[in-house]
Amino acid sequence: MKNKVVFIGMPGCGKSTIGRLVSEELKINFIDMDNYIENMTSKTIPELFEHGENYFRDFESLACRELAKEGKAIISSGGGVVKRKENIDILKEESFIIFIDRPLEELLGDVDISKRPLLKEGREKIIKLYEERYELYRLCADKIIRNDREIGNIVNEIKEVILDNLEMN
């Protein structure tokens, strides 16, 4: 049985916030993949992107391989982790993948583009990424959770899904 949960979804959909809350309630290790990559490389995500998106994606793939070896954990992935099939194949072996599906209108209203290299172009870029990735998120997910209500309700729903589907005790 799988012993990790990986949250996927658009930048700003709530992966890290929800992941932290779920991990605190279940007392399971939380790992933010972007922070993991920054610690691994001693560079920020924007600094890695200065060398090109593929340069960053190579480190993201390496992080997926390393995190697949972790014990019990809640992992918040980067928004583009689904762009490489190998990443999802690696993560699916030991992880239950949850797509945090947040309505586009809410993403457009909340996302801080200054800290997200791929979103520097603003609203149009968010819409384009959403259109490119939405179906990938749906196809990769073991479970889809809609983030369009009170966060406590979302956390409770995810806890139920985890306790029903994973070996986390």
From Swiss-Prot:
Function, in words: Catalyzes the specific phosphorylation of the 3-hydroxyl group of shikimic acid using ATP as a cosubstrate.
Binding site for Mg(2+): 16
Gene name of this polypeptide: aroK
Name of this protein: Shikimate kinase
Catalysed reactions, semicolon-separated: shikimate + ATP = 3-phosphoshikimate + ADP + H(+)
Residues that, per the record, bind substrate: 34, 57, 79, 133
CDD domains noted in UniProt: SK
Cofactor(s) this protein requires: Mg(2+)
Subcellular localization: Cytoplasm
Class of enzymatic activity (EC top level): transferase
Family in the record: Belongs to the shikimate kinase family.
Note accompanying the cofactor annotation: Binds 1 Mg(2+) ion per subunit.
EC nos: 2.7.1.71
SUPFAM superfamilies named among the record's database cross-references: P-loop containing nucleoside triphosphate hydrolases
Organism: Clostridium beijerinckii (strain ATCC 51743 / NCIMB 8052) (Clostridium acetobutylicum)
GO cellular component: cytosol
Molecular function terms, GO-annotated: ATP binding; magnesium ion binding; shikimate kinase activity
